[in-house]
Structure formats: structure tokens, C-alpha cells
Amino acid sequence: MDKFSWTNEELSALRSLILDHHKIVIFPHTAPDGDALGCTLAWSGILRQVHPSASVHVISPDVVEDYLSWLPHLDELQIYSTDPKHCLQLISEADLIFHLDHNQCSRLRHPDLVMAAQASQAARVLIDHHLDPEPGCDLVFSYPEASATCELIHSIICALGWREYITSELATLLLIGLITDTGRFMYSHLSPHLFRTTSDLLELKADYPCIIDRLSYHNPERHIRLQGYVLDQKLELFPELRAACITLSQEELQRFGASKGDTEALVNIPLSIEGIDCSCFIREDKTQIKL
């Protein structure tokens, strides 16, 4: 039994929106991670099969980090930061827009991109697992109890009767979202449904060994050197609070030539220390402090 409480009416409305429209745009959030890319690329792959006469475009606000550059179907991605004119044209022509793995348009980051998405006359659908989705979408599938948006997308695909369209590559995309958003199934936000989803994706021939190999054994040298610096110089422990904190400034990030992907898992490292239950990572970006 599915743990998500959508209605048959909502599923019927979603099916109709998809099949009645022909120019579809799908957005992940800015600086897309494994869940954002996995769910958007997998969803676009499904839509292309069930509605072959439609044009389906995934528009990422930013380039993809190196650690995800091997993902299947990545060549289908449109990158706003490298070709804004083309992406804005696709948005202006769209009659259906999907917002996946983000709860508000501002998470597209680029002002012109945000404005184009908000000004579009297209029907809009939000599918996400973050709290407090902004109003304005025609259909909202917001379930914070989900471990990842890829978990939601898999459930929606199956509920629509489209499981047969999940190829091995699409299953791999959905599994990468589950693995990365749960810290390889180590975070507390886990559920039996998550593992049933994982089991089904493996049955559908998701390439689990490839995912683990790419995430574990293909790190650039700068990633390892940054990690060593953080552990030696930047890790602060607060045993009385059972907590740890890591901070990195812009100068330090630039010194190592680090990208966002190089800092992705730093916050998890202190949790392997006996007596530490809480870990915080604070990064200075160009325009904000990221917690």
C-alpha cells in the first residue's frame, strides 16, 4: 500500500494535464543535487514515452557538479546559466511546467529565470518533499514525509500505471536520488516505504554498483585535500552538546578550487565520532551564508 495520501481525482488531473499539453518544461532547483537531477530526468523520460508527441525539456538553473556528471540522460539537460536565451524561449512557449524537488520559484535563483517561471501562463505542477510549498500551482503533490522527491516520483509513476516505462536507466536515476538524499540510507528520515521503493528499483535493474562506484571512487584530488584540511583545521567539537561544527570561507574554498559538490558530504563526517549526534556545516557563498 502506498503511504502517500493523494486522491484518484488528483492522479486523474495529473494524467490529463500531461496528455492534454504538448510543450512541457521541468525544473530542478538551483545547484541540482542527486535527487533533483534524478527525479527530473527520470520524470522527463517517462513523459516522453507516455506522450511521444510532446516536447519535454528539463531546464537546470546551473551546471551539474562533477560528481554527478556521469548520470544517464544528462545530455538532454538544458542549462540556463550557459544558454539563458534558449531556456527563456522554451519557458515562454511552454504550456505545462513541473517544479520538482523545490517548494518555491525563488529556488531557481536567477532573477530572470524566476520571473519567467512566475510569469508563464502554463499550467504548473509541484512535486516535492520540502515543507511549506508556495501557492500558485494548479496541482501540488507535497509530502514532507518522503525521504526524497525520487521516492514520490516513483510512487506517482506506479499509481498512474506507468511502471512498465521505467527503464534500467530511469530506475538508476531514481535510485541515485534515494541514495544521495538519505546519505546512503544513514539519515533518520527513513521508512519501510523507502526500502520497498529501493527494492522495486533494483528489480527494475537500477545499477546500484555503478552508483556506489561513482560516488565513492571517482573523487577529484581537490576533494580529498579539502576533506583533510577540514578534519585537521576546521572541525570544532562541542562534547557537552554532543555537537560538531565545520565552517569554510570563500577564500578557503577558492584556495582548494572547491565546488559545491566537494562540500556535499562534509557535514556527515563528524557524525562518525563517538558521542556526536549533531553536525553543522556553514559555508560562505558569494552572496550568502549557507547553513
Per-region residue spans from a language model:
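Hydrophobic helix-and-loop "lid/oligomerization" segment in the mid-to-C-terminal part
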Residues: 2-28, 38-67, 71, 76-79, ...
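Short glycine-rich anion-binding loops that position phosphate/pyrophosphate groups of nucleotides
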Residues: 31-32, 102-105, 130-132, 250-251, ...
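Short glycine/serine/threonine-rich phosphate/pyrophosphate-binding segments
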Residues: 34-40, 105-110
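A short helix->loop->beta-strand "cap" motif at the edges of active sites that frequently abuts
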Residues: 51-54, 119-123
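Generic beta-sheet signal
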Residues: 59-61, 80-82, 100, 127-129, ...
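Short, conserved loop/helix-junction motifs that constitute active-site signature segments
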Residues: 90-92, 113-122
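N-terminal glycine-rich phosphate/adenylate-binding segment common to multiple enzyme folds
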Residues: 102-115, 134
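Short alpha-helices
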Residues: 127-197
